[in-house]
């Protein structure tokens, strides 16, 4: 899960009339070299009023004829920039980890705490590093094996085959210090995506261990059932499981009272893997994927998009695209599974429209935040000064004629769904990862971030990956130059020069999507590896998605 813990659930999940008052809807041919437009298309600052009325089953969200799909061609200058950015991300995963396990930390400042999601991104980053020549295949394979053996060999790090959100980076077991102690379905899903990618790339013993872990995942154990959940919340994958006591982390406990019920990226990724499970008794019915609610909204007239009101952060459109090649799967078909009142959606196009909305609203910048602009956009979850923030923006909601409240779309007071610009902090990974959808705008944003300077002329956000001189596990965070590329987030000063802030830390689940999204935009390597795997092929077939 993108927020650091379930405690930040309010920023990402549905808050309807569910259990305990919470009903969780929780929880990559325009040439890239072209300069992106400088004026936003029409759109709303705050979607307080409905944009119009539609019958959901009549809506098809698909790619316009002639629009370029990834992978793209980039200029030599752009490729040089992308090499640098990816190399910096890889340095985090290679150098910041614990030498005993190989596992990258959740954040560089806490080397003993790893997130299983971060490890999933880490495993997927290693094939990129081999193909780019930063490490040898043998080195990457050995590190991958070390990580997988560590995780497979510790029986206290998982329940029902899914992993605890946070683990001890030195042992792969229960951490003495963690932000939460829960078995997390989304963080496990992100790990399994990395394991599947590694299995396809390395084969051999890596595949044997990785495939075994994937097969052990019993998604059916985590499905919401019974009176503990509202009727419209039942038979979805829950966010996870919490033990009764940490003394017995695999003993008794209970499912969390939150479910993946909306069609954000995290919801779909969890449910896809649950459908694709290679062990028949562990799998869920494919119709669950199509029952995920698809609330509709609009930023540009005539271009509907699926959205949900619990988070307008850009990351909710990014994660699944790091592995699933939605661009070439075409619009899905809920009606084929007898699920009514659902739009047919090409999820790549849906993410592109959402990306466009984020940039449009940053250019208009009605909140007057000094950081936001033509080349600084993509409000998303990240560190902020004094904590962690999940800002975001929303389309105008469309009235879904004939649809059932709560069952087909989340119920909320649309007058209170307003764009949340937070304190104006921007995380470079957000616009950078959107290179999968809007390559020209993403390149321009990364070049902007790369060129920002301090008053003394030194780089504001950039730490050159070529300058890395530390040993494995010595991150030199205090020195401020660890060689990990972009800082996690920043906020520019207000007029008068006060308020400048740059995040001092580096976060695995921000570095991860950036390196993978760029690679998919350049070569499609990660989506190709993912779709080569038998488990993924089975999931695509079961869901009757288009050919890869």
Where are these predicted regions, by residue range?
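Ser/Thr-rich, Pro/Gly/Ala-heavy low-complexity intrinsically disordered linkers and tails
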Residues: 23-58
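Ser/Thr/Asn(+Pro)-rich, low-complexity disordered segments
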Residues: 52-548
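Generic alpha-helix initiation/capping and coil-helix boundary signal
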Residues: 7-10, 43, 313
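Bacterial N-terminal signal peptides
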Residues: 7-24
